């Protein structure tokens, strides 16, 4: 499925288990996190005793990564860099070319890089974007994957990580929890062979992503950030309107969206929602456009 060397793979009880294992193995004193992003990275870093720095993506840049600015933050005091690609909640992607540039700089500064690809399979041309192939070139890289999002199986609790760093693989093998992959997850691995589901899901998400962005991007009272993943981030521009207002309105209509107020670097003007079936997406878009 990933075309990776099985000897370079680590299995875990979801990506949270693998994030914890990565911190326990690397033992970084200082971690740099590209944000706004998934809060679990910071929580795990602090549990591991690491200091945390942030490199915050900016609204004015449409939350696109400014690689040159990030490069200026990379130095010998940083032990670990964390990137979510595509990023949650911005739904923005970093190209493989830019990842190469970042990884080269991290090698120079002896920085270990963790790239979380929980949403990568929703991206167009995943095989051209994924950093898995880069693990053959960079031994300071680990790539995390999950079945929770693309395969819609969060309850299975199954994730996997890929790295060519033999020291990491040995240390992680010695410290990971025994029997950390349950029987149901082992059986569910057959889902990676379901080409019909994989191709159908990719096609559906790509079509709906384009339709949703087109339908919402012309509204002047919101700023819609062009998505690369299976969800979209929106900034509310109507004076006095908050994410809580839109969230409550959607709840009353039987719809669930994400109020992004608690994301550091966003605030109470941002909401996010995931793409569903076409008819559900139509309802979601129309409902949000009723209030914004």
Residue ranges of model-derived segments:
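PLP-dependent aminotransferase-like
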Residues: 8, 24-83
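PLP-dependent aminotransferase class I/II
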Residues: 140-225
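Conserved PLP-binding catalytic core of the aspartate aminotransferase-like
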Residues: 205-206, 219-253
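Helix C-cap/helix->beta junction micro-motif
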Residues: 48, 108-109, 138, 219, ...
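Phosphate-binding glycine-rich loop
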Residues: 1-30
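Active-site phosphate-binding strand-loop segment of PLP-dependent enzymes
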Residues: 59-123
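PLP-dependent enzyme catalytic core of the Aspartate aminotransferase-like
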Residues: 252-253, 262-292
């Amino acid at each position: 499925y990933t075309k990776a060397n099985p000897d370079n793979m680590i299995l875990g009880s979801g990506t949270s288990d693998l994030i914890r294992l990565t911190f326990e193995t690397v033992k970084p004193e200082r971690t740099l996190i590209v944000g706004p992003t998934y809060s679990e990275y910071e929580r795990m870093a602090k549990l591991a005793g690491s200091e945390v720095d942030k490199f915050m993506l900016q609204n004015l840049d449409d939350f696109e990564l400014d690689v040159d600015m990030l490069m200026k933050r990379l130095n010998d005091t940083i032990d670990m860099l964390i990137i979510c690609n595509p990023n949650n909640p911005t739904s923005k992607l970093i190209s493989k070319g830019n990842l190469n540039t970042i990884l080269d700089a991290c090698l120079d500064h002896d920085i270990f890089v963790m790239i979380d690809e929980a949403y990568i399979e929703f991206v167009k041309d995943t095989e051209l974007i994924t950093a898995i192939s880069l693990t053959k070139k960079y031994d300071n890289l680990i790539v995390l994957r999950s079945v929770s999002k693309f395969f819609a199986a969060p309850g299975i609790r199954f994730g996997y990580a890929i790295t060519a760093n033999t020291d990491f693989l040995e240390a992680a093998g010695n410290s990971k929890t025994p029997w950390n992959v349950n029987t149901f997850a082992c059986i569910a691995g057959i889902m990676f062979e379901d080409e019909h589901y994989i191709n159908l899901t990719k096609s559906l998400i790509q079509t709906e992503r384009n339709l949703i962005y087109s339908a919402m991007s012309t509204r002047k009272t919101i700023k819609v950030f062009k998505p690369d993943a299976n969800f979209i981030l929106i900034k509310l521009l109507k004076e006095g309107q908050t994410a809580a207002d839109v969230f409550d309105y959607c709840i009353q209509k039987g719809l669930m969206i994400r109020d992004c107020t608690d994301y550091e670097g966003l605030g109470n003007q941002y909401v996010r929602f995931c793409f569903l079936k076409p008819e559900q997406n139509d309802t979601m878009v129309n409902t949000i456009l009723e209030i914004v």
